[in-house]
Amino acid sequence: MAENLKKLAQSESFLSLQDKVCFWANDYQTNSCDQNLNCCIELIEQVAKVQAQLFAILTATAQEGGHNEGVETIKSRLLPLLQTSFSSLGVGKIIQTEIRPIQDFQLRSKNRQSSLDQEQQQSDGDSFIESQPTQVQDDLTESGKNLEGTKNGSAISLLAAEEEINQLKKQLKSLQAQEDARHKTSENRRAEISRTDRRPSGKRNSERPQDVVSNYEKHLKNLKDEIAVLSAEKSGLQASHRQTRSRSPSPGPRGPRGPRGRRRSRSHSRSHSRSHSRSHSHSNSHSNSRSNSPCTTVAKIRSPSPNRSKMSSVARKAALLSRFSDAYSQARLDAQCLLRRCIDRAETVQRIIYIATVEAFHIAKMAFRHFKIRVRKMLTPSHVGSNDFETAVSDYIVCHLDLYDSQSSVNDVIRAMNVNPKISFPPEVDFCLLTDFIQEICCIAFAMQSLEPPLDIAFGADGEVFNEAKYRRSYDSDFTAPLVFYHVWPALMENDCVIMKGEAVTKRGAFWTTVRPVMRCRSRSLSPICPRSRFGISTVSRSRSPSPIRCTFARY
């Protein structure tokens, strides 16, 4: 191939091709048409000779490359050129003569590739056949291991079953021995009973009817007490109904205190009749009946229905939570309206209501403890040796929650508020304005102590870290302040879980700037009747004496 290439490089036709093209280009304008055509044909003939030599060199080069080399180059570059560039017959003959070796080379390469593929498939099949026995052997060993493990597991389970059978046999023997001993003891008891039956048993026969009669008498006494309570309730309701029907409306304009005084007179008559009937029916068990002062105001009196004990704890809890929520949303706002007529500062009003709520819970819990002690003393003689004594005490308390002396608790709360240094204000204002609110909170707190577990309010102190789990900030708070300035409403807790969130006011730096030395507060004497004007402002000056400084933290 190298010799042919050297001959082509030194051939006259290849060397004179460039010179002829240059001469033709220079003489093209002066030559005639025939002369130009002759020049062009001469160049084509010379180029054809060069191409024939190049194809010979191409064939030799492809043969030197072997079966696989140069195939892609010929396919991608030479074949498209041959299809588009040469259309004349003479050139076609030359191409056919030169292309045949290339086609033979392509055919040989295809045959070679197919033979290589067949050899590869055959080698793969031989390797699979060789690896199949080893795979079968591995499967056999694995199945043998599984069989051995199953055998060991079955042996272990068999041993466990045998051990369990032995234990059951031992238990059966012990039970048989116990049964034999029981039969022997029963036979001995029968023999003793038969011996004792021969003795006179008049005394024993006389004791049994006495026990039955005493039980019937206790049951009859309880029924009579319930009947007396219900009859007193009925008579009180009938009397109040007759009074309301006999009372005619006045033609003139009524004063602002008319409806409130009328409601208080009705509640006073009802409470008086109920307390009188209960003191009559429970004279043996209750030594002190409820006091009925002229200023007694009962916010919500619940009838002592016998079905009260049957009410589930969940239903009572839901009702009390609803009452507590109503007290926050309605009764608290009413109390604020009353106090705002006398006090300008909203902070002082909210502090007064919060302290009243805390004191009411504290006093109600103390009253519940004393009430439970009295119930225990009363029920002890009739439940001696019984296992359900605590259940009986709880049922009695739930059934007789209306025996709670709420007015006495209201008086105690007002006394505690009078000596609290945080809410000292001018003497023209009296805490008797909050009697209805305090009485409602006391009744709610007293009833919450009868739940299982009881509900209580969370401890709160000014300056404590704000807890989002217990309180929500009021609308006028600084939402970036970390400390509580003062509390608006306490949080309701069940053990350590928050049932209802309270409300607190947070202000950054306000707690330290408003701290002032604690002054001695002036105690307020509490009279049964609170003289007030239209808005609860006292028109009669009352004597006040200095009292010692008390701890300002909330009591629980």
Swiss-Prot record:
One MF term in the entry's GO annotations: molecular condensate scaffold activity
Q: Looking at the record's lineage, which domain of life comes first?
A: Eukaryota
- Record field: compositional bias (Basic and acidic residues): 179-214
Coiled coil ranges: 152-184, 210-243
Q: Where is this region: Interaction with YWHAG/14-3-3 protein gamma?
A: 1-290
Q: So which tissues is this one expressed in?
A: High expressed in testis and weakly expressed in lung, intestine, and spleen. Not expressed in spermatogonia, spermatocytes, and round spematids in adult testis but specifically detected in elongated spermatids.
Q: Residue spans with biased composition (Low complexity)?
A: 113-126, 284-294
Biased-composition ranges, Polar residues, are 129-138
Q: Which residues lie within the region annotated Disordered?
A: 110-150, 171-214, 234-313
Query: What keywords were assigned to this record?
Result: Coiled coil, Cytoplasm, Developmental protein, Lipid-binding, Membrane, Mitochondrion, Mitochondrion outer membrane, Phosphoprotein
Q: Which residues carry this modification: Phosphoserine?
A: 13, 85, 123, 127, 154, 157, 303, 305, 527, 541
Keyword Membrane attributed: yes
Q: Name one GO biological process term.
A: positive regulation of cardiolipin metabolic process
Q: Where primarily located?
A: cytoplasm
Q: Where is the composition biased (Basic residues)?
A: 257-283
Entry's Gene Ontology cellular component terms: cytoplasm; cytosol; intracellular membrane-bounded organelle; intracellular membraneless organelle; mitochondrial matrix; mitochondrial outer membrane; mitochondrion; sperm flagellum
Q: Where in the cell is it found?
A: Cytoplasm, Cytosol; Mitochondrion outer membrane; Mitochondrion matrix
Could you tell me which PANTHER family the record lists for this protein? MITOCHONDRIA-EATING PROTEIN (PTHR21771:SF0), MITOCHONDRIA-EATING PROTEIN-RELATED (PTHR21771)
Subunit relationships = Interacts (via coiled-coil domains) with BNIP3L (via BH3 domain). Interacts (via coiled-coil domains) with BNIP3 (via BH3 domain). Interacts with YWHAG/14-3-3 protein gamma; a protein that also plays a role in MALM.
Query: Its biological function?
Result: Key regulator of mitochondrial quality that mediates the repairing or degradation of unhealthy mitochondria in response to mitochondrial damage. Mediator of mitochondrial protein catabolic process (also named MALM) by mediating the degradation of damaged proteins inside mitochondria by promoting the accumulation in the mitochondrial matrix of hydrolases that are characteristic of the lysosomal lumen.
Q: Which family does it belong to?
A: Belongs to the MIEAP family.
What's the protein here called? Answer: Mitochondria-eating protein
Taxonomic lineage of this organism?
A: Eukaryota, Metazoa, Chordata, Craniata, Vertebrata
Which gene underlies this protein?
Spata18
